[in-house]
Every structure is written in structure tokens, then in C-alpha cells.
Amino acid sequence: MARITVEDCLDYVDNRFELVIVGSKRARQIATQGKEPLVAPENDKPTVIALREIELGLIDDAFLAATDAEPVEHFAEPSEENADNLYPEA
């Protein structure tokens, strides 16, 4: 496992606070949303993978905005039978 430093990541992210936000969003995408890592996982945890991607310049805020903009699932429309249950009288 290669050591990743904050200074290496700051070449691609404006400041440490943005690094935390971008890194956590990307780690969450990898861990829970099924997004594929852009680097070989090498048995690393999602947070380390995210920082490695940032260190290599593969991830930035614009990339995250583009990958988060996925279509929203539509909810089922209420049927006539259940319409009375939606808005009960007071």
C-alpha cells in the first residue's frame, strides 16, 4: 500500500476542507452506491481508494457532480382505491 499524503492531494483540490468533502463523497460512491474505482483496489478501503484517485487527478468536484446527476426513480402513482387513505379528513 502506497502512502498518500494530504499535500499530494492538494495539487488537485483547493484546500483541506474540500479534500474531506470530495474524498468522502467518492468513498461513499464506491462503498455504498456500487461505483467502480478508477484505480486498482489493491485490498484498500474505499477512503484510501478515493484519496488515491484524487492524488492521481482522476477525481474532482466536477466529476462527482456529473456522477451524482443520475435519473431519479419515479414513485408509484396512487390508485383510486387508496386515494382516501392519502388525505384523511381532520
Swiss-Prot record:
One of its GO terms (cellular component) is DNA-directed RNA polymerase complex. InterPro entries: DNA-dir_RNA_pol_omega, Pol_omega/Rpo6/RPB6, RPB6/omega-like_sf. It catalyses: RNA(n) + a ribonucleoside 5'-triphosphate = RNA(n+1) + diphosphate. Pfam families: RNA_pol_Rpb6. The gene is rpoZ. GO terms for molecular function: DNA binding; DNA-directed RNA polymerase activity. One of its GO terms (biological process) is DNA-templated transcription. PANTHER family: DNA-DIRECTED RNA POLYMERASE SUBUNIT OMEGA. Belongs to the RNA polymerase subunit omega family. Keywords: DNA-directed RNA polymerase, Nucleotidyltransferase, Transcription, Transferase. The keyword Cytoplasm does not apply. This is DNA-directed RNA polymerase subunit omega. Its EC number is 2.7.7.6. It comes from the Bacteria. The RNAP catalytic core consists of 2 alpha, 1 beta, 1 beta' and 1 omega subunit. When a sigma factor is associated with the core the holoenzyme is formed, which can initiate transcription. Promotes RNA polymerase assembly. Latches the N- and C-terminal regions of the beta' subunit thereby facilitating its interaction with the beta and alpha subunits. The keyword Transferase applies. It is an enzyme of class 2 (transferase).
